[in-house]
A protein has these predicted regions:
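Membrane-proximal transmembrane or re-entrant/amphipathic helices at the cytosolic face
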Residues: 427-477
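Signature of the first transmembrane helix
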Residues: 3-61, 96, 100, 155, ...
Length: 477
């Protein structure tokens, strides 16, 4: 339990940086590059990221699970990591070849050839992304230290080199190089954990179990990564910029909601491997997700105009509808990760996850083709919300059917009831304050105090109560 708490604290620190970094950087970048420049850069980033996902074959999920099983056997661990790395190197080069062919043959991509060319670096070197090794080893300290260091360097470079709306290429280059620097850091540190050797390897042994996860990842990527690409191909660069602005803001809450699940995933894999079909920590994870995602969603929906103005600028006001549509995305994604990753995938039921995300992919493709040409970024936002909602329901159905795992769904009603108090509070701040920044700060502070007070005094929330006990112990020392 101590290791879970320690890793959770490191993950919270990482999550905090995941929030602080966009909060510091995105408002600056959005105002400098504008909707069109931001759209062009992220069109290239997301398009190349799809090929990175293809090349990864599902190794991040499979590797984490398998590393967790052999973490205490260094020889087996070294062989496993070497085999998966070699396999990823092969697929990365194949994916890079396909990327190059598509780039040279597409008229749409050729309009910004330099951007897509520099983005190809993350396709070619994507095999160096081995966070799955450290997550499987439950070594979240290295992931956190690396991320904080590189993000600090990235912020400094962005402030120094991105100064006008014409600096789209420097922005993209810095973004790509920061990713690659993180990969190299991973590889260097990995040499202290495993002994790499490319002799007597058997990569074919991993192909069958990885194949299902590979298909699963492709389906997921079609609606979590390719959503931006749909807007780029079926609408305009400006629409991409609007969509990215809404998505960036709505997804700020996802790392918070997923923090506990990320730490517990290796433990879920070991628990199911030991034939324990109803781990207690799953209810804890469910409660944690709902308790955080519900107020985050309600708050984002009510404060969407002010959030967009402060973090993106007046030029992104057309993203308001998309922002409100996406406000409950953290809830859907948090729960689908619980049902899909922590339960079905961790227990080896990847085929059921594949069925779930395949259904989601088909629905998303149809919705994007219908909605994006007519409603641009708003259509893409509606498509992804419907898709994530359906995937959440389907994964829950399979998890319940397979293990008869039950969750306290009254948690939803309780948390939404607590959030009803947000309406008059935020209305008061919007009525008597004119500064969007002050409205946000005042509303968040007041709503957080009321929500936590209700959770503690009225609902006896275990997370809030434990936090208070911990703080009291620290103060009494």
């Amino acid at each position: 339990m101590a290791s879970v708490k320690r890793n959770f604290l490191f993950n919270i620190l990482l999550v905090t940086s995941n929030i602080v970094f966009p909060v510091l950087v995105f408002p600056y970048i959005a105002r400098i590059l504008g909707p069109q420049g931001l759209g062009n850069a992220h069109f290239a980033l997301q398009f190349s990221k799809y090929f990175v996902t293809t090349a990864s074959l599902g190794i991040p999920i499979y590797g984490l699970r398998e590393v967790a099983k052999v973490k205490n056997h260094k020889a087996k661990l070294s062989k496993l990591v070497s085999e998966l790395l070699l396999l990823n190197i092969i697929t990365a080069f194949l994916s890079f070849g396909v990327y190059a062919i598509v780039l040279y043959s597409s008229g749409t991509l050729a309009q910004n050839f330099d951007l897509f060319a520099i983005a190809s670096l993350q396709v070619l070197l994507g095999f160096l992304a081995i966070d799955w090794l450290f997550a499987g080893l439950e070594d979240f300290k290295i992931i956190t230290v690396r991320s904080l260091t590189i993000r600090l360097i990235t912020v400094l470079f962005l402030l120094f080199f991105v100064k006008t709306k014409n600096d789209v290429f420097p922005y993209l280059l810095i973004s790509i190089l920061s990713i690659l620097l993180g990969h190299l850091w991973n590889l260097f540190y990995a040499t202290t954990k495993v002994k790499f050797s490319f002799k007597n390897l058997n990569i074919s042994a991993h192909l069958k179990p990885i194949f299902i996860i590979f298909l699963m990842n492709l389906c997921i990527a079609m609606y979590t990564i390719f959503d931006t690409v749909w807007v780029g191909f079926l609408s305009t660069a400006t629409a991409v910029g609007m969509y990215i602005s809404a998505v960036k803001l709505s997804k700020i809450g996802i790392p918070i909601v997923s923090a506990l699940g990320t730490v517990l995933l290796p433990r879920s894999a070991r628990t199911f491997a030991a034939n324990i079909n109803n781990p207690i920590h799953l209810q804890t994870s469910f409660n944690f997700i709902v308790d955080l995602a519900v107020p985050i969603g309600v708050g984002m929906f009510l404060l969407a105009p002010e959030l967009l103005f402060v973090f993106s600028g007046a030029a992104f006001s057309d993203a308001l509808i998309a922002m409100r549509l996406l406000s409950f995305l953290p809830l859907f994604i948090g729960l689908s990760n619980l049902f899909g990753m922590q339960i079905l995938s961790a227990s080896g039921n990847d085929k059921l996850v594949l069925k779930s995300v395949f259904i989601g992919m088909l629905i998303n493709v149809v919705l994007n083709v219908i909605l994006v040409p007519k409603f641009a970024h708003n259509g893409a936002a509606l498509a992804i919300v419907i898709t994530e909602g359906i995937v959440t329901l389907v994964t829950f159905y399979f998890a319940f059917k397979k293990f008869a795992i039950r969750f306290n769904t009254k948690r939803f009603a309780r948390d939404f009831a607590a959030c009803v108090t947000f309406l008059p509070l935020i209305w008061l701040f919007k009525t008597y304050l004119t500064s969007p920044s002050l409205i946000i700060v005042g509303s968040l502070t007041a709503c957080a105090i009321i929500y936590l007070s209700l959770q503690h005094f009225w609902f006896k929330n275990e997370f809030v109560n434990q936090a208070i006990v911990t703080v009291k112990k620290k103060l009494n020392k």
